[in-house]
A protein has these predicted regions:
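Bacterial Sec-dependent N-terminal signal peptides
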Residues: 1-27
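Mid-length scaffold segments of soluble, non-membrane domains
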Residues: 80-134
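N-terminal post-signal-peptidase region of extra-cytosolic proteins
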Residues: 52-53, 70-85
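A short, Trp-centered hydrophobic/proline-enriched beta-strand micro-motif
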Residues: 59-74
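Helix-rich interaction surfaces within compact, conserved domain-sized segments
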Residues: 124-195
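One face of beta-strands
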Residues: 64-66, 90, 95-99, 148-150, ...
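Solvent-exposed coil/turn segments that connect beta secondary-structure elements
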Residues: 71-73, 93-95, 102-104, 142, ...
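Sec-dependent signal peptide cleavage junction
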Residues: 19-60
Length: 195
């Protein structure tokens, strides 16, 4: 009698486990499908936001009033510094260009933020676009402490951009990587300009 009782309990337990395993597999599939659906919605939303940001950045370049807020700066020796975007930027507005660097390890500096701020008049602005939507924008900047060519590349479909500053009298180019936004939407803090 005990054997029959144990056998019956064992069979019920085994059936229950198989039902649990099947429902667990079904739940896993449903969870994966829901996760894929959420990812697709997230990707579509992100793509829409990137498209809107790209159109705003393109309009700002055409209007000549923009700021590239840099997340990192690449130096000629291969060194990359990750920096604060509101104190490291390249901007253009009202025919005036500004380039500012400021580093987190504050030391005495000309602009009071740990770096330099240079301004100058802008000339020779040119803009072109390739078939992939990448925009190439360049200009000359001439001021008391700067004489350089600035080349900006806006990546197609997003507002990610890079600006390469090539000085006219030295070969020490630096590149700012970050996001290009209209000047009015910029969150920049300007230090004291040189001279």
């Amino acid at each position: 009698m005990k054997r029959i009782l144990y056998l019956t309990i064992f069979l019920y337990t085994l059936c229950g486990m198989s039902v649990y395993a099947q429902s667990r597999g079904t739940r896993g599939k449903a969870w994966r499908l829901e996760r894929e659906r959420q990812r697709a919605v997230y990707r579509a939303l992100e793509q829409h936001q990137d498209s809107v940001s790209y159109q705003e950045a393109l309009s700002a370049l055409r209007d000549g009033s923009w700021v590239l807020e840099a997340n990192n700066i690449n130096f000629p020796n291969g060194l990359t510094r990750f920096v604060s975007s509101n104190t490291n930027y390249v901007s253009l507005t009202n025919g005036q260009g500004t380039i500012q660097t400021a580093y987190a390890n504050f030391t005495y500096s000309p602009n009071g933020l740990g770096g330099v701020t240079v301004q100058g008049n802008v000339s020779g602005v040119s803009m072109s676009q390739d078939k992939d939507g990448n925009v190439y924008y360049s200009f000359n900047i001439q001021g008391n402490a700067i004489s350089a060519v600035v080349s900006v590349t806006l990546t197609g479909g997003t507002n990610q951009a890079s600006a390469t500053i090539t000085p006219n009298f030295t070969g020490r180019t630096i590149t700012f990587d970050g996001y290009l936004v209209p000047y009015a939407q910029g969150t920049i803090f300007q230090g004291m300009p040189q001279w």
